[in-house]
Amino acid sequence: MSAEDLLRWVYGEYGDKLCLTCSWQKQSSVLVHMVSELDLDVNVVELDTHLFFKETYETRERIVDRYDLKLIRPEIITVAEQHKQEGPNLWERDPDRCCHIRKVEPLIQALEPYDAWVSGIRRDQSPSRADARKVERSDRYGVWKIQPLADWSEKEVWAYITANDIPYNPLHDAGYRSIGCIPCTRPTRPDEEERAGRWADSDKLECGIHLEDAHKGDEGKE
């Protein structure tokens, strides 16, 4: 089933109980464009950690304006509040805990009204995502997880963006093949896998939102 056909099907099944999460990376651009072209009225959930790059926020504004998105932002504590509760620079001392506070807990909150969630995961992004399926049951969040681009390559993502003149995060042009929070993201070298620039100085592989068996304070280890 193509990505477009899968989106049509899942929207027909779940309607306003379906949402799309966006990180404002290249795969987010593709999915937002597809949803718009298919005329699907889908809420878009953003997990704004308050630690994004300036270019990421600018990309968000361009995409929201172009596609007239209904953006849902779950409540996330400020960085200052986190410093008070957990101490300064938690991302350096315990990145798993930081991701849990700033991404996992807000996503749990955001998904409560929904029965299905569209994500931009692709199998070729990293070994930890190699077994991703297009439709999975997430017992952790109590929703169906829909991954229309699971079988797409990075090359196919860029070809779709180029063919459809879709706005994308300019950090991708500066060597950032995967983009997250400022303290935990660096450009990727040509010989590295796509997500190698994330948490590069640790053995952490994932922020935790896509790990079904992850527990509080233990995200990212597989």
Predicted region positions:
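Nucleotide-activated chemistry modules centered on ATP-dependent adenylation/adenylyltransferase
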Residues: 1-222
